[in-house]
Amino acid sequence: MKTFSPTPKDINRQWFVVDAQDQVLGRLASQIAHRLRGKHKPEFAPHMDNGDFIVVVNCEKIKVTGNKLADKKYYRHSGWVGGLKTTILGDVLADKPSRALMAAVKGMLPKNRLGRAMLKKLKIYAGPEHPHTAQNPQPLTLPH
């Protein structure tokens, strides 16, 4: 019996829509990253992008546990001396809630070209509407 190695023609991608209302940020992000990577499929290969497309709606109603709204910090640097910028999670969720979920999922994917390609299959929207109805995304229920 030979070992099966998938090829690009073997990839069958589906579209799923996930409702993020009352979901915990980290738990939701780990399940989304799992699906984006394709680890739920029997033909998973770590060197290929065979994950599905995920559309997340109601991102503005996402939950966090503990004191993370005040304690968790996001850092970015301008490249200049003294150019370190710090933002807390509460401000990020108030300003652009999709950015917090995107950062959480990005941290759970590979840090290379393949991970960037996987992240392009994630579509996040703050409200309940999304423009991907033509792809006929199937509702995906994730445990709380």
Swiss-Prot record:
It holds the Pfam family Ribosomal_L13. Belongs to the universal ribosomal protein uL13 family. Keywords: Ribonucleoprotein, Ribosomal protein. GO terms for cellular component: cytosolic large ribosomal subunit. Coiled coil: none annotated. It comes from Desulfovibrio desulfuricans (strain ATCC 27774 / DSM 6949 / MB). The gene is rplM. HAMAP family: Ribosomal_uL13. This is Large ribosomal subunit protein uL13.
